[in-house]
Amino acid sequence: MIIRRRLVLKYVVLTIVSIACMACLTLNIQAKPILTVYTYGSFVSDWGAGPKIKSSFEQICNCELRIIGLNDGVALLNRLRMEGGNSPADIVLGLDNNLIDLAKKTGLFTESHIDTSLLKLPMELKNNIFIPYDYGYFSFIYDKRRITQAPKSFDELINSTQPWTIIYQDPRTSTLGLGLLLWIQKVYGEKSAQIWREIAKRTVTITKGWGESYGLFLKGESDFVLSYSSSPGFQLLNYGQDNYAAALFSEGHYLQIEVAAQLKSSKQPKLAQEFMQFMISPTFQKILPITNWMYPVIDMSLPTVYQKILVPQKSLQFHAEDITQHRNQWIHLWQDAVSHQ
């Protein structure tokens, strides 16, 4: 009887110890801080930069990196404005140079202490809140099997006797769509309304974001899709398809610089700063050219596939303040033009 009691007591003690150890292990797992990043949908896709970024950062941060893919860049800012100081996000990654003035005026973002003096960009972007992480040029992509003589200017695309069709993104939700709005405004100025009416005649559909529009294009739903001059590299590298190309326009191409920023309401400010610093490191930057298909912001060699990618020789820009001042007016002009077709 005594032996049995001792065995029972030993079993009880071991059980208590095991439960305690499991509880400690659970607490340790739960104690890992979580850094939440809002970004656009394509960034977190299986072929996007997100999965590799998550793996690389978690190896050095002793944290969980939670990357949440939403809609395109403009929609990201709209979401943050709606959430205000109650946003669960610590960082937003996916705004761009065309939104930084508008984003700054929301008061939702805090200064960063990241040294950007060594960054290599096509234009100067001095800002201590919004940190650049890549850049690219807006362009219309086409399939060389369908289009044997690509347009060499906006005028050729719009005024061609060929029944060419276009898919692009909504400027109210997408940084690409906003980029096209600014591109046309920069090239045509007061004639922009007429240009939009001509584009409307060729438009198959207008999507909320890049992923949907590019997917439709690859299915053959249009002759041209608004994307980036570097986009054809994806099919070339992953599928060996060299039939996609960017149409280079004599008027020049609008430049986009993508940026990230830390929210004032972040519950992990130190970890957020660590991620922002990591963002301009070689480890992060080398992932982008063949996942996000954009150019890095540090001095580094590009993958060999970029040797076959066309690069615009002329880039176009508006000052950020001009965009903030006229953005709503230009969007209304676009809405009016396309709604009357």
Locate each region found by the language model.
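Extracytoplasmic ligand-binding site segments that recognize negatively charged/polar headgroups
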Residues: I34, Y38-G50, N71-A75, S87-S222
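Short alpha-helix C-terminal cap/hinge motif
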Residues: P51-I67
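A ligand-binding cleft/hinge motif common to bilobed small-molecule-binding domains
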Residues: N98-L102, L218, S222-N243, N292
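Short beta-strand->loop
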Residues: T110-T116, N128-P132, D155-I158, L236-Y254, ...
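Periplasmic-binding protein-like
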Residues: L121-M123, G136, W196-A200, I206-T207, ...
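A bilobed periplasmic-binding-protein/Venus flytrap-type ligand-binding module shared by bacterial periplasmic
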Residues: S139-R146, Q185, Q256-Q268, I287
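Mature extracytoplasmic/periplasmic domains
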Residues: L263-F318
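Extracellular/periplasmic bilobal clamshell ligand-binding domains
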Residues: V305-Q341
